[in-house]
């Protein structure tokens, strides 16, 4: 089947339903593409990226105030912006920004794995296995996770563990939110 308006609608629905659940929207999109045999799968990657950019846009709109504050705090940390007269630093926001940076650092080496991971997007069996693995990971986190740590009790090593989980979740079918939530609970 060539890519059509109907298949694009299906993909938009999958993306919209799956993105914020711990079920790997990318994995579900790949399964849908493999199942429907939509055109040249390599050409579909651009459409998938656009779907994810649309989701990112929605997140930016929903959290624009917090994101603006994080950006402002980051610029002040780098001394690229002076605080307004009478304004004071925001230690909780600065702490959150530091944790976000630490949790993002493990993704840098993952960027170089693209050539190895790309073929897995075409392997429906592998993606299905990874989706099941995400389910077991969530079950383990629910059963064995401590889950009682507050934001104030979080440490840099916790942020790093969440970042490492995020790095592992670049594997097609593993849910980034599912793995990071599980890492945070365990």
Which residues make up each language-model segment?
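Single conserved hydrophobic/aromatic residue that forms the stacking wall/gate
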Residues: 1-6, 10
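Extended aliphatic helical segments
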Residues: 9, 14, 49, 59, ...
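Context-gated lysine
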Residues: 2, 81-84, 149-152
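Membrane-embedded helical hairpins/re-entrant loop segments and their flanking transmembrane helices
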Residues: 7, 14, 18, 28-36, ...
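Membrane helix-loop-helix hairpins that form the core translocation module of multi-pass transporters
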Residues: 34-143
């Amino acid at each position: 089947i060539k890519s059509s308006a109907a298949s694009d609608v299906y993909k938009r629905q999958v993306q919209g339903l799956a993105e914020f659940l711990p079920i790997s929207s990318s994995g579900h999109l790949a399964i849908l593409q493999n199942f429907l045999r939509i055109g040249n799968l390599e050409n579909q990657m651009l459409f998938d990226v656009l779907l994810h950019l649309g989701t990112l846009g929605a997140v930016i709109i929903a959290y624009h105030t917090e994101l603006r504050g994080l950006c402002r705090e980051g610029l002040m940390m780098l001394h690229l912006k002076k605080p307004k007269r009478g304004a004071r630093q925001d230690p909780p926001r600065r702490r959150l920004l530091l944790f976000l940076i630490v949790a993002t650092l493990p993704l840098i080496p993952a960027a170089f794995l693209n050539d190895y991971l790309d073929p897995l997007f075409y392997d429906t069996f592998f993606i299905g296995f990874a989706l099941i693995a995400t389910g077991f990971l969530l079950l383990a986190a629910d059963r064995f996770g401590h889950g009682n740590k507050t934001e104030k009790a979080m440490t840099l090593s916790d942020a790093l563990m969440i970042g490492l989980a995020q790095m592992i979740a670049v594997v097609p079918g593993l849910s980034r939110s599912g793995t990071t939530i599980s890492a945070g609970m365990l």
